[in-house]
Amino acid sequence: TSRISGIGIAGIEKKIKKLHKKAFQKNVLILPIGGIYKYRKNGETHQYQGNLIHMLQSAVSSNSYNTYKKYAQGIYDLDIINLRDLLDFKKPKQSIDIKEVESVDELRKRFGSGSMSHGALSAEAHETLAIAMNRIGAASCSGEGGEDSNRFIKKKNGDSSNSKIKQIASARFGVTIEYLNNCDEIEIKISQGAKPGEGGQLPGFKVSSEIARLRHSTPGVTLISPPPHHDIYSIEDLAQLIYDLKQSNPKARVGVKLVASSGVGTIAAGVAKAKADVILISGHSGGTAASPQTSVKYVGVPWEMGLTEANQILTLNGLRHHVTLRTDGGIKTGRDVVIAAMMGAEEFGIGTTSL
């Protein structure tokens, strides 16, 4: 059951009948435009439309805050898509002294570019993101699949392409002790927002010699990540893995990536008791994560629901101060960040937008 109601059984029945009628009506030659997975004019509404992407890119390349504001307004003016689009801010009765606000350098530490692997992007894009995040003091995540050890060494100009966060997924591709030792945080990925409860698959044609080398596998052979971690079937198992990872790199925080879902608060409480330092609540509206089309369209829950539940349950159980709450999944503007912060998030992942 959903905490925000929904269309209900009657609504589902109405939709099915409407589709059935469309399928069998006579003398109709017009096919639906579509645009479910890729933007098409007059098709389904997408938040990232071409003009808005171009506007954001222009704002970044020209360092223009005014252009960014036009982009943010363009996102805000779209049809209501997310739960946060239904919310608005109350004007405070009293302003906050700017001295009480964190400095820009401190604020940047709260941001990251999301978990995207070398295999999902490319070596160039993956390294560029890491360098950019390191330059501003934010964090990039390696994603699943390892990272070239050459990146652990700083470049001659002082830049670092080493991802501050290293991810461990169910298949453990690319995970070595050297990999774990060259990071500030280790992230255990339990699931992904775009396909909760499902595993992953990297098709054979994408497994180049470079990817195979990093993942310690064979070029051209499809790589499967199972839905569960086969050494985690309880909170006690998770606690053991967290303990082991902290022994491998005592200086690193250990985070657990969860997906927004009904009951995620209870899971978050267990994760906090397992001595995790960070809990990430991932929403459904970010990147596709190479998900099946049915999952992209029909699966997942907004981070607004998962984040608020996790924050409340952790607080009620006296565990909130033990962990840092992070969220990601379709964060596009400063407004999204502020709403996430008001719902309990302390750190924020911005993946698609950073690309």
Task: Pin down the residues of each PLM region.
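Conserved alpha/beta-domain cores
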Residues: A120, I131, S142-E144, K166-R172, ...
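Glycine-rich phosphate/ribose-binding loops and adjacent secondary-structure elements
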Residues: T1-K22, N150-R151, H229-L355
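Amphipathic, alpha-helical segments enriched in basic
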Residues: S61, I96, V101-V104, R108, ...
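Conserved, well-structured core domains of diverse proteins
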Residues: T1-R213
